[in-house]
Amino acid sequence: MWGIHHARLHTTLKIQQWLPLGSRILIALSGGQDSVCLTRLLLDLQPHWQWFLAAVHCDHRWRADSTANANFVRQLAQKWHLPCEVVCAPDLPKTEAAARSWRYQVFESMAKALDCTHVVTAHTQSDRAESLLLHLLRGTSPDGLATLLPSRSLGAIQLVRPLLGMTRAETAAFCQAYGLPIWQDETNHNVAYRRNRLRLELIPYLQQHFNPNLEEVLGQTAELLASDRAYFEAEVERLAPTVIREHPPALDRLRLRELPLALQRRLIQRFLRQHLKRGLNFRVIEAVRALITAGNGSQTASLPGGKHLRVCGRWIELVRPMPPPPAPVPPGQGGRSPPPSPLY
């Protein structure tokens, strides 16, 4: 098979070098139209790139038809002479986030077992647009809107999303044009899930009343934000040693004053991520940023975990919570030493 989408992907891979010649590639194959489209494209391009290709299917055991879905994937892979592993979740994931975390653990471990250098997933431009909208409605930073990067590290493996230039409508048309069998996941039509409601109700409304090319423009926006994110991440890594003191933890506020607002916020965020387990948000970052020009001795309100930051000369220092005072000694026990610790 060879068509316009083969040519487009072939050209993109030559330019971007996401999947170099001779790479060992593990395909995340759910059996849906997007992953079937991706698998067929890679199999058709394989002679030109001399890849090793294998597939993995993750069975979350959420649906009554999950075993039938897994068997469908096995049969399709066998028909296409594609090595395929089906992995069942040992426990039912409680949330979509937990399921996603488990899937990516499977991708990484299976790739290592097969000596694969790359894992590919079939996320499309439509997925990217949906993710951007979801994050925007929930509230996030510009970096949070730079969703579904085309390529990123997954431990020692490289995760690649080759279909970000195709919409879901295009993958459906591809499967139909080439007569490819696909598995219909009925849960994709359940609007109890936020992403499904956005996909089935909000995006069609926005396309009809605001912009018929919504998925394309949102995908382009995510791509522009991703390039900005890559630049700022590199700048933060370059500047961090000049701004962040590790021991004891502190920020150099004189150095921060010299930097643009965007870098101030990102460096503060980087510092706080090292020391806060939870609760990092815009208000916390702005409270710390206010200390850049505050008077000596100024401090933030208590941060998550009971910590706070305080101005001490040129430094904004992290102050850990004081340990609780010792319990009062009961009457009649004053001066009595505690029993010695047991020896092991």
Please provide the spans of the model-predicted regions:
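Core alpha/beta nucleotide-donor-binding catalytic domains of modification enzymes
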Residues: 1-201
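AMP-forming adenylation/ATP pyrophosphatase catalytic core
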Residues: 4-34, 54, 89-91, 102, ...
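A broad structural signal for alpha-helix termini and local helix breaks/kinks
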Residues: 46, 114, 210, 272-276
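Mid-to-C-terminal catalytic subdomains of enzymes
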Residues: 172-223, 227, 313-314, 320
